[in-house]
Amino acid sequence: MKRITWLSSADAPDWFPDPESALDEPPGLLAAGGDLTPQRLLAAYRRGIFPWYSPGQPVLWWSPDPREVLFPAEFRRSRSLDKAMRNRGVTVTFDCDFAAVVDACAAPRDAAGGTWITPEMRAAYVALHALELAHSVEARRDGELIGGLYGVALGGIFFGESMFARARDASKIALAVLVENCAARDIHLIDCQLASAHL
């Protein structure tokens, strides 16, 4: 029977168990504990591992298989998205307001008011952004932030963390512009981590 590994503060920040040892149920759960230092986060991403947990839980580390990925070279916009990008008056920028994008992604989206982006998680990704390793894409209309996403770029891969939309198709437009700019940024794969009907 597989069991998750507990990471302690005594463990080297770049040590993780083999992703092959991740649980089947819940799918991909690999380890618990540790911290969200840049060193540990980067070590995790290099092995296809990411943190995802709720307030009150220890840091939970995941490596699901299969996982959702996009190949920018194979990306084709749908007609409806192409029309939305032409007609909605949306301007897309990169790394212009990282903290605002994370805060918008962290805003509760359901009646229960839950979010997985804890203050510690926010601080960790802001620290990665300061190191120019975490990046945001902002979609604005008339200067107002209406959608966007953020993630980590490492080794030719963009690891998408979260996205939000305050207007129809705004996050999809941000994602499409990211994908279309991947070649210029030396990104060959986008790891969406978990399958989503939104993509």
Show where each model-derived region lies.
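N-acyltransferase acceptor-side catalytic subdomain
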Residues: M1-H198
